[in-house]
UniProtKB/Swiss-Prot annotation:
Pfam families per record: ABC_tran
UniProt cross-references to SMART domains, sorted A to Z: AAA
Residue intervals of the ABC transporter domain: 15-252, 262-506
GO cellular component, one term: plasma membrane
Domain of life of the organism encoding this protein: Bacteria
Reaction it catalyzes: D-ribose(out) + ATP + H2O = D-ribose(in) + ADP + phosphate + H(+)
Name of the featured protein: Ribose import ATP-binding protein RbsA 2
Major localisation: membrane
InterPro entries for the chain: AAA+_ATPase, ABC_carbohydrate_import_ATPase, ABC_transporter-like_ATP-bd, ABC_transporter-like_CS, P-loop_NTPase
CDD domains per UniProt: ABC_Carb_Monos_I (cd03216), ABC_Carb_Monos_II (cd03215)
List of residues binding ATP: G47, E48, N49, G50, A51, G52, K53, S54
Subunit and interaction comment: The complex is composed of an ATP-binding protein (RbsA), two transmembrane proteins (RbsC) and a solute-binding protein (RbsB).
Lineage of the organism: Bacteria, Bacillati, Actinomycetota, Rubrobacteria, Rubrobacterales
Organism whose genome encodes this protein: Rubrobacter xylanophilus (strain DSM 9941 / JCM 11954 / NBRC 16129 / PRD-1)
Membrane topology value: Peripheral membrane protein
Length: 519
């Protein structure tokens, strides 16, 4: 079946929600929403963070009960009081944070919550269990050691285990929440192939993602939620990216990228002959005041490693970094911050934030000594700084005393950026700053980058999204296999030129490598 074709062939929906309303205290999360999933279709569910997507699917998954409205499964009325009841009805949930048991084997994870095969003497038939697990994975075109602990697998392979578990339970519907957020280009391609296989089997897939290019590639229908309300359900073929963004956030895609190029000023940061064995070599790079330099390249090109070496997380084998003309001592993030350089990591949850800490504590952590005298912290000035930066970056989802773990991905990223701005940096190294966040939050971060450049700060923007690189950069530097392979001014930079420099392939064939653009 072609993407965008009418799925289901008039069949009864796998499940259908009618007039769903869910309230939490005085807050209405979703109101009067209709949604259905047909056999063998990929139905994309999109909207900004807080639009109600997760709430709606948690009702389907048995985690929440609706306050109003009804649920049908296979044309029959249904009401789930637990996830187990939802699973028994043939609905499998694959959350972004996979619910696997890392210490258990692949085979054991596939049988969690399911009766394990028994020998005639009543013991667990481990041989049969491993064999069936291997067969189910093989049906997905995957060969894994089913005896290995899940913790040893890559994120992509853990995801395949979750999908195989759903199939072992004979799921008729699979709900995937941001399934490619942590995958490389190749891994995402493999996932798309598996989703196509699920469609051929007649399994319905609900696909939740912020990545519009993926949605238009694999979805048959798209449902848009905004502020807890249903905006529209339409065939994917009847929409385009600009229209979809307008439905999601109320303004067109053309208004998303906020870049007002400024005349670059003095050199702020200079990299000379920087190298690190096995990662990158002979890198020369210059950043000027008021300039956004995009750093493009494929997975493994060395971009993240370069940024971390500039900041001091990694130590170079050769070369030097200069800030305002003075050599920056290698291997010292503290010294880098003192000189006005700040790195915002791609992995915000594990490297950029302390999840149990409050928004305030995360923002002020890097400047706490500023408020400390004789071992005591002056809480008033600390609160004032955190509140001012949280307000300036429009951090939403709670107050500055709430745990940062409660915020959406986009708001967590704003907190990481606020922490960097607390240092008043001259140079910002931004590693995938919009990865995994919704389109509205992306727009706000683009405006922030433009504002920072307008204030005279230098920004190094690492991104795997070529549209982001092209729209936000004054210059584009390309890395390939650890070396600088190209540099383009704003007027010279095109998608084709960047991909040619990133792959070493000249001409139109370079475009086929675009899917591999990454860290």
């Amino acid at each position: 079946m072609e993407r965008g074709a009418a799925p289901g062939g008039g069949k009864v929906p796998v499940f259908r929600l009618r007039g769903i309303t869910k309230r939490f205290g005085g807050v209405t999360a979703v109101e009067g929403v209709d949604f259905e999933l047909l056999p063998g279709e990929v139905h994309a569910l999109v909207g900004e963070n807080g639009a109600g997507k997760s709430t709606l699917m948690k009702i389907v998954g048995g985690l929440y009960a609706p306050d109003e409205g009804s649920l049908e499964v296979g044309g029959e009325p249904a009401a789930f009081s637990s996830p187990r009841e939802s699973e028994a009805a043939g609905i499998a949930m694959i959350p972004q944070e996979l619910d696997l048991f890392p210490e258990l084997s692949v085979a054991e994870n596939l049988y969690v919550g399911r009766r394990r095969p028994r020998t005639r003497w009543g013991g667990i038939d481990w041989g049969r269990m491993r064999r069936e697990a291997g067969e189910k994975l093989a049906s997905l075109g995957v060969g894994l050691d089913v005896s290995a602990p899940v913790k040893r697998l890559s994120t992509a392979n853990q995801q395949l285990v979750a999908i195989a578990r759903a199939l072992l339970r004979e799921a008729r519907a699979v709900v995937m929440d941001e399934p490619t957020a942590a995958l490389t280009g190749r891994e995402a391609e493999r996932l798309f192939g598996i989703i196509a296989g699920l469609r051929r089997r007649g399994v319905g897939v609900v696909y939740i993602s912020h990545r519009l290019e993926e949605i238009f590639r694999i979805a048959d229908r798209i449902t848009v939620l905004r502020d807890g309300h249903l905006v529209k359900t339409a065939p994917a073929s009847a929409l385009d990216p600009d229209e979809l963004v307008r439905l999601m956030v109320g303004r067109p895609l053309s208004e998303f990228f906020s870049r007002h190029p400024h005349e670059p000023g003095e050199v702020v940061l200079e990299v000379r002959g920087l190298g690190r064995e096995g990662e990158f070599a002979d890198v020369d790079l210059v950043l000027r005041r008021g300039e956004v330099v995009g750093l493009a390249g494929l997975i493994g090109a060395g971009r993240t490693e370069l940024a971390q070496t500039i900041f001091g997380i990694r130590t170079p084998d050769r070369g030097e970094v200069r800030v305002f003309g003075e050599v920056l001592p290698p291997g010292s993030p503290r010294e880098a911050m003192e000189r006005g350089v700040f790195y915002v990591p791609e992995e915000r949850k594990s490297q950029g934030l302390i999840a149990p800490f409050s928004v305030k504590d995360n923002i002020t952590l890097s400047v706490l000594e500023r408020f400390t005298r004789f071992g005591f912290v002056s809480r008033g000035p600390e609160r004032e700084l955190a509140g001012r930066l949280a307000g300036a970056l429009s951090v939403r989802g709670g107050g500055i005393f709430d745990p940062v773990s409660r915020l959406s991905g986009g708001n967590q990223q704003k907190v990481v950026l606020a922490k960097s701005l607390a240092r008043e940096p001259a140079v910002l190294l931004l590693d995938e700053p919009t990865r995994g966040i919704d389109v509205g939050a992306k727009s706000e971060i683009y405006r922030l980058i433009d504002r920072l450049a307008g204030e005279g700060r230098a920004v190094l923007l690492i991104s795997s999204e070529l549209e982001e690189i092209l729209s936000m950069s004054d210059r584009v530097v390309v890395m390939r296999e650890g070396r600088i392979s190209g540099e383009f001014g704003r007027e010279e930079a095109t998608q084709e030129r960047i991909m040619a420099a990133a792959t070493g392939v000249r001409g139109p064939s370079a475009a086929v490598a675009e899917e591999e653009a990454g860290r």
